[in-house]
Structure formats: structure tokens, C-alpha cells
Amino acid sequence: MLETEGFIQKVKGKKSIVLEKKNLENISLTSIQTVQELNKLQNINLETDLISLYIVQGDKKLMKKFQVSESADFYKVVRTNSLNGEVLNYSTSFFDRKIVPFLNEEIAKKSIYEYLEKDLKLKIGYSRRDINFRKITPEEQKYLKLKDINMVVVIETHAYLSNGTLFQYETIIHHPEKFTFTVIAKR
């Protein structure tokens, strides 16, 4: 597992080589982890705050992303993650209600993925992540409170079930001074 995650390299006839130490400032882009899993793995206490949870109907951009008709509706979940009282990221997630028919405040505060996997018995397969940088919006600034910084790191995620069905579209706005993302490249 450590080898497939890119943390060690096994060399035949030799000891394993540690490639990186995973910590909060060095989060892998190659795995899908919940806040609870990250807390346990790194022995930290990231806290999730729910800002809003409501249903969105007939949004043309979302319908195009999810490749669905106008009758489709989605849950919109806006949250922040904090460490020691400092907001590290601001996320906006959309879940297809045909796949995720019910969400409430308790689930959104705890772990949506745990609910999907354990209660709904969905098999989460993979995600596509696009990383870009842009100017911060007033809404994001309200929560991230960047002083002299007007740019943010944006990770746009399309998450799919194991059968290839898109069930979540998310943008996570990261405080640019609080995270370093790492991918181990192999030849």
C-alpha cells in the first residue's frame, strides 16, 4: 500500500526507501480521503463546518457537467475545513440526487463519503482533479481571510462511482500558504 501511494520505493535485494513523509502540508493528489481518514492517518483534528446545504434545480452548467436533463436536481453543500481555528479550505460540492437521494446537516458535517459507502452501499471508484489558480471571490475571502493575498489554489474534482457514473462535482478553494500538494512521479 505504501508503495502504491508513492511513500516508499521497494528495491529488490535492498531496504525500502522512504520517498516522503505525509503531513498536513503535503497532501497526496492520488488518493481520495475524507477528513476523518486524514485526521486518523495524520493524528490531527481538522474540523468541518457546514455553511449551507440546499437543493439546486435546473442549473445549466451543472446539467452539462453531469450530462443530465433539465429535470435534474442536485444537493449543494458548502463547507470549510479548519485546523486550530484557522480555515484552510472552502469547498462547494454538488451531488446528483438521482444517486444521492438524501443528505442532511448531520451527514454533511460528519462524512458524506462514509454515508455513501456504508449507508447507501455505493462504491466510489475514482476522481479527476484539475488544479488552477485564480483571484479569490468575496465569499471565499469571508471565510479564508487572506490578508495580502488575492490568489487561491482551486482543485476542481469530478468524482465517479466504480461503474463510471459521475456522482459529485466539487471545487475546493485552498489557502495558498497552508497546503502543499505532492505527486510522486516514476520513470
Where are these regions (language model features)?
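N-terminal helix-turn-helix
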Residues: 1-18
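All-alpha effector-binding/dimerization core of bacterial HTH-type transcriptional repressors
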Residues: 22-187
